Amino acid sequence: MSGMNEKSIRFLWVGRPEYWIALALFAVTLALFWPATGYDYINLDDHLYIPENPMVSGGFSWGGVHQAFTTVYEQWWLPMLWISYMADIEMFGEGPFGHHLVNVLLHAVNAGLLFWALFRMTGARWRSFFVAALFAWHPLRVESVAWITERKDVLSGAFFMLALLVYVRAAEPPPARRMGWVFALMSLGLMAKSSLVVLPFLLLLLDYWPLGRGGDPWGSGSWGRWRPLVAEKIPLFALSAIFIVLTLITHGTAGGE
């Protein structure tokens, strides 16, 4: 039995080192941002989003979930964001620690997911690591992780990374019908932050490079190759359009207001 375990460990280390790279990215990112778990709320929307938010302050409840999906709060319709705060309070109690902890964990997970998505797309192990590490450890990421209000960034980022991974899998031969999962993950991400409206455009860019699904978009017969790639994303474009309109309405800027 021990021999089998040794062989398995040796295979993972020698044959699939990317597992260890993803784990290392997670661990180092967690260590770098761990001090944020000791921070307090700050007077930049934290109190407005959590202690003073009646949807969130009581913890998780089905009534709160219903309210999250039916209420525009402070010009935002972000039900997944409010539900995530409810879950924090339910698991860790009142106070900022749980919110900070979940932010840090989400960011560390996102670092590993980004590496894995890049590696699956390119096969370039160390370049994928470098890009993921730059994303995870850049000082500009501190605001999104250490500021509880910016949960929307790391939470939508998690759905974004998962959507990328599922899409890469869907693009591999033999053809896999996983676009429904991409749609679902994009929907959840948009309910945390509306910036995910760019996802279908990004997927088209990935079709060109590095996935190489459509070939040269300017070459002979290119539309015949690209038409099905655009068509499969029509539901995603429609979803983006819906959330763009919804965001304009909730911010009071639609219809000339």
Identify the function of each model-found stretch.
Residues 1-257:
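Polytopic membrane enzymes that build or remodel cell-surface glycoconjugates and lipids
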